[in-house]
């Protein structure tokens, strides 16, 4: 994302310079000045010291070792801790939102250990696919990841073993979903939204309708959503999900509940959600509806379903291909 921003900025500078030159007579000295400014801009953009171990077309990417666990690794995209994996134990889940995604899978998917047909929008460090492979042998998983260089790093430095049970498709997620068969998946996981850049075409009602097409009637859609204290994007995205799916729940993360930036997780299906099983899975990490934590000093997440969810979503925007101001919603 950072690379794209820099590249777009340079293109805009060059375009603006060309337009300015075209509309006036410019001396040789002025032209040299313009060229010098452009050169300084370019050198500045390329020559800035970067913590990147790998600079891809989309990310400044690094892998950090866990100082407290020899087998622990954190994937950093730009300057954000995106994913964590334990190379020796794929069932060890470090991040709150990843544990909630797994809670949703285990609460609403088939019986424990039964294989899944899973699709992932965004790969990260492949943390959830590793978990599913370890806990549900025989699962068939498809990972849709736009950044091929990221895939290389995950395989080479995070020891992901690409076998016949996992297909990795490099390219745009929406185009890839369009190629999937009807009723072919029991699980779709969305983890393509960042805190600084949201691919709006993966947030719209039209795209979610395509996700619903791919899911079986009993399948579930689970997505990680990052937003700020105003929760405008979170509310809009969950409201949009509710336009497509009959049964929806949202788990507001501890950061959101405490009025900060943070992750939340939405769960959706055309079949009733197993709310009791979900509550058991969440335990003390999440409270239900308006209930309060039994420890007032401990900030926890919050699950909203039914009337509580309807009240939360009242007045929220519905995102469509013609109207999806995701950047403004996150910034608002």
Set out the residue ranges of the language-model regions:
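Membrane-embedded alpha-helical segments of integral membrane proteins
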Residues: 1-23
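Composition- and surface-driven signal marking solvent-exposed, interaction-prone regions
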Residues: 203, 236-237, 280-282
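Soluble small-group transferase modules, centered on the S-adenosyl donor enzyme superfamily
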Residues: 3-6, 25-74, 78-84, 91, ...
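The AdoMet/dcAdoMet-binding core of the Class I SAM-like
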Residues: 92, 99-220, 229-232, 244, ...
């Amino acid at each position: 994302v950072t690379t794209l921003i820099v590249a777009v900025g340079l293109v805009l500078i060059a375009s603006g310079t060309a337009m300015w030159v075209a509309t006036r007579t410019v001396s040789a000295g002025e032209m040299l000045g313009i060229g010098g400014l452009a050169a300084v801009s370019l050198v500045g953009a390329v020559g800035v010291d970067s913590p990147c171990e790998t600079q891809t077309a989309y990310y400044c990417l690094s892998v950090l070792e866990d100082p407290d666990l020899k087998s622990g690794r954190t994937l950093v995209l730009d300057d954000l801790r995106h994913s964590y994996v334990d190379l020796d134990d794929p069932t060890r889940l470090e991040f709150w939102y990843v544990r909630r995604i797994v809670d949703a899978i285990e609460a609403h998917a088939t019986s424990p250990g039964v294989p899944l047909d899973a699709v992932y929008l965004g790969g990260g460090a492949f943390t959830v696919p590793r978990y599913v492979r370890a806990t549900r042998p025989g699962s068939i998983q498809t990972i849709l990841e736009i950044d091929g260089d990221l895939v290389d790093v995950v395989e080479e430095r995070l020891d992901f073993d690409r076998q016949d049970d996992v297909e990795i498709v490099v390219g745009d997620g929406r185009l890839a979903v369009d190629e999937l068969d009807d009723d072919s998946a029991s699980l779709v996981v969305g983890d393509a939204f960042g805190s600084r850049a949201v691919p709006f075409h993966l947030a719209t009602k039209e795209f979610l309708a395509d996700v619903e097409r791919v899911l079986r009637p009993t399948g579930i859609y689970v997505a990680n959503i990052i937003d700020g204290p105003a929760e405008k994007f979170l509310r809009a995205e969950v409201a949009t999900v509710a336009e497509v799916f009959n049964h929806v729940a949202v788990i507001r993360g501890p950061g959101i509940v405490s009025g900060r930036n943070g992750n939340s997780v939405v769960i959706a299906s055309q079949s009733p959600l197993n709310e009791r099983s979900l509550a058991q899975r969440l335990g003390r990490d999440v409270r239900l509806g308006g209930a309060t934590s039994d420890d007032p000093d401990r900030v926890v997440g919050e699950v909203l379903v039914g009337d509580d969810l309807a009240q939360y979503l009242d007045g929220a925007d519905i995102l469509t291909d013609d109207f999806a101001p995701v950047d403004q919603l996150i910034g608002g």
